[in-house]
Every structure is written in C-alpha cells, then in structure tokens.
C-alpha cells in the first residue's frame, strides 16, 4: 500500500521520548457514544458489530473525532473482544448490557476447543486499518490495539463484564493450569493480531489490560504481566522505516509501574489515581508515560477542565528527556459534553508548549 508521509508525528516522537514542540493528546474511546455523529453512524449500521465489522463504517467513526478536534492520533475503531469472537465464542452486544459471549470458557472441555484463530477471520479489522490509513492521508498516526491476554480471558470465562470476577478467580485458584492454557492461547493470538494490524498500517499499538488491577500482588505478575510481556516481545517493532511504539495500559496497576515499564514497551498508560510526577521519577524516564486526567473532570465545565489539564501537565513537569502523551485515565464517558473536549485539547496544546521549551 502506498502511504502518504506523516504531516504530524508528534505523538510517535513523544512515545519514543524524542523532542517535540508540545504535548500530544488523544483520548481513549475518542470515537464513541459522546459524539452525536457516532450515534448516527451506529444507527445506520444497525448494531455495534455491524459497525465494527464494516471497514467503511469503522473508518468513518475513527475519523469523526479528528473532524471536531485537532487530536494528535487516531485510534482504530474496533473492540478488544474481536479475538475471542474469532475463536468461536459468539460475541454479542445486548442493548443496555454490554458485551456477552454465547459460549463462555468454563471447564476443561471448553479450553480444549480453544485455538489461535485464523487471522483471515479478522480480515475486516485489517481492511479497516488500511482504509483508515488511506483516508488519513498522513494527517496523524493510526493506533492499533488489542486487549491483554488476562483481560480478554476475564470476559471469556465470565461470559460478560463482572463486578467480582468470581468465575475467573475460581479458575485461577482452583485450576490455574486451565487458566494458563487460556492465557497462552490468548497471548499467541494477540501477538499475531497486533502484527497483522501493523502489517496493515498501524503506526503504534496499545495493549489494554483493563482488568489487571483486580489481581493480587504476585498474581498480577504471574497471570497478567507475564503474558503481556510475551505479546510485546513478539511484536514487529519497525515498519515503514520507523519504530512502531508499544503502549501498555494496566488500569489499577500503579503499584506495579516499574515492572510494567520493564516489559519491553515504549510507554506506560496510567489511570487517574497515579501522580504523573511520582510515576516519572519511578521509571526514571526509561519509558514515556500516557495519561492521566480523570474522565469525570469533563463534567466539571470548561474552567475546571482547563485547570486540571494544567495541573496534570505540571505534575509531569518540564519534559526534558522524558516523554508524555496526554490522555484520560480511562475511556471517555458516553455522557461527556463534546464541547468541553475542545477546551481540553486546546489547553493541552497551548499550555504544554512552555514545558517543551529549552
């Protein structure tokens, strides 16, 4: 595929801790239900899966936030559960209930049926990546992503989201051998999946370990981080003549920051409970940091959003040899006022320039 040269590579350079003129910003779930235009496209598609599995629709919603805001990266519109869906678990999004699987993985016979899916079954994702790259025309980089092996295992075993993770933790403590087998398959599948996204044109990739923080110390390292590391170690790290940065985000994982930073990634995503300055000292600028405004700040109005953006940037401090990508500490709420996002992006771009001077 012939690709246009990047007009704005500030996001990629910040991830690699290279000098940039300002702090780049993008938002987790930036293409989502808080945007009226997203809801209109989803209505045309008929369902979430109808949206995600149609490369043209996926491209359309990926680009929608960039039409509103001068964001520094686009992120592929998809879902972390496409991989287990390709394994035959039957993903469905029930209205008002979120994702659920028709065939959850609960016992030895279920685990025996699991296998790394043929990547051709996920071709719609890679077609979407190619379509988005073409339509971006070098405007900003495109981020690909996947769920971490542990996080997608949570959904596979529970069958849906969970408040207490009773089923997967029952397996963890009672049949750890079964859980390790699931995680091995997930890690291999995720490695292939992300590499296929990179081959299709993703210029950075992110692993969402959304549920890593529900694990006890020691078990996080064994059941989450070890398999995240397997994925990271197997990724294509150079494409189109430049490095493909890898971001790892473990929500609730602040206590393990140093260990996450040592997994081979280029950047660590932080939730809003971690002080950026403290985190920076802990990793000693060995990796870039991404985050970490509380998503609920967006409900405080423009003045509060601008003040909290400045406070977050000040916490990281003068950039120097570090790297900072501004983001929320988790995905943007569907109820967020779109006009306040404009205030956030403007404040980050304007205020951060002084932190990059000299």
From Swiss-Prot:
The enzyme's first-digit EC class, named in words, is: lyase
**Mind telling me which residues the site (Transition state stabilizer) is annotated on?**
79
- Under which EC number(s) is this enzyme classified? 4.1.1.37
Alphabetically ordered keywords of this record: Cytoplasm, Decarboxylase, Lyase, Porphyrin biosynthesis
A cellular component term, taken from the record's GO annotations: cytosol
Write out the catalysed reaction: uroporphyrinogen III + 4 H(+) = coproporphyrinogen III + 4 CO2
Please give the Gene Ontology molecular function terms for this protein.
uroporphyrinogen decarboxylase activity
Pfam name, any one? URO-D
**Keyword Cell cycle applies:** no
Q: Which GO terms describe its biological process?
A: protoporphyrinogen IX biosynthetic process from glutamate
Annotated localization: Cytoplasm
Which range is the signal sequence, renumbered to this chain? Answer: none
Spell out the family assignment given in the record's similarity comment: Belongs to the uroporphyrinogen decarboxylase family.
Question: What function does the entry list?
Answer: Catalyzes the decarboxylation of four acetate groups of uroporphyrinogen-III to yield coproporphyrinogen-III.
Assembly information from the UniProt record: Homodimer.
In Swiss-Prot or TrEMBL terms, this protein is called: Uroporphyrinogen decarboxylase
Q: Which organism is it from?
A: Bordetella parapertussis (strain 12822 / ATCC BAA-587 / NCTC 13253)
């Amino acid at each position: 595929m012939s690709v246009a040269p990047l007009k704005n590579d500030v996001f990629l350079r910040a991830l690699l801790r290279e000098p940039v003129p300002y702090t780049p910003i993008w938002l987790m779930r930036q293409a989502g239900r808080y945007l009226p235009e997203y809801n209109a496209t989803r209505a045309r598609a008929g369902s979430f899966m109808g949206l995600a599995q149609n490369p043209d629709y996926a491209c359309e919603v990926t680009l929608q936030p960039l039409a509103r805001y001068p964001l520094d990266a686009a992120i592929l519109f998809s879902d972390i559960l496409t991989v287990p869906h390709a394994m035959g678990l039957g993903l469905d999004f029930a209205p008002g209930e979120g994702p659920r699987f028709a065939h959850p993985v609960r016992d030895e016979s279920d685990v025996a049926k699991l296998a790394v899916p043929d990547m051709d079954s996920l071709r719609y994702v890679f077609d979407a990546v190619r379509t988005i790259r073409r339509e971006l025309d070098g405007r900003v980089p495109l981020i690909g992503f996947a769920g971490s092996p542990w996080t997608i295992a949570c959904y596979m075993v529970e069958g849906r989201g969970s408040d207490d993770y009773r089923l997967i933790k029952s397996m963890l403590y009672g049949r750890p051998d079964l859980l390790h087998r699931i995680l091995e398959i997930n890690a291999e599948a995720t490695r292939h999946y992300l590499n296929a996204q990179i081959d299709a044109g993703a210029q950075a990739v992110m692993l969402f370990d959304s549920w890593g923080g529900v694990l006890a110390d020691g078990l996080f390292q064994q059941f989450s981080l070890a398999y995240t590391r397997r994925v990271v170690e197997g990724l294509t790290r150079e494409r189109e003549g430049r490095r493909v940065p890898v971001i790892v985000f473990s929500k609730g994982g602040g206590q393990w920051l140093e260990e996450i930073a040592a997994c081979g990634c280029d950047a660590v995503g932080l939730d809003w409970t971690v002080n950026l300055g403290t985190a920076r000292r802990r990793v000693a600028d060995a990796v870039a940091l991404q985050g970490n405004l509380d998503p609920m700040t967006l409900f405080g109005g423009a003045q509060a959003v601008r003040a909290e953006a400045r406070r977050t940037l000040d916490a990281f401090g003068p950039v120097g040899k570090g790297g900072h990508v501004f983001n929320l500490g988790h995905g943007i709420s569907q109820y967020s006022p779109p006009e306040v996002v404009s205030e956030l992006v403007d404040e980050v771009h304007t205020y951060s320039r002084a932190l990059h001077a000299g």
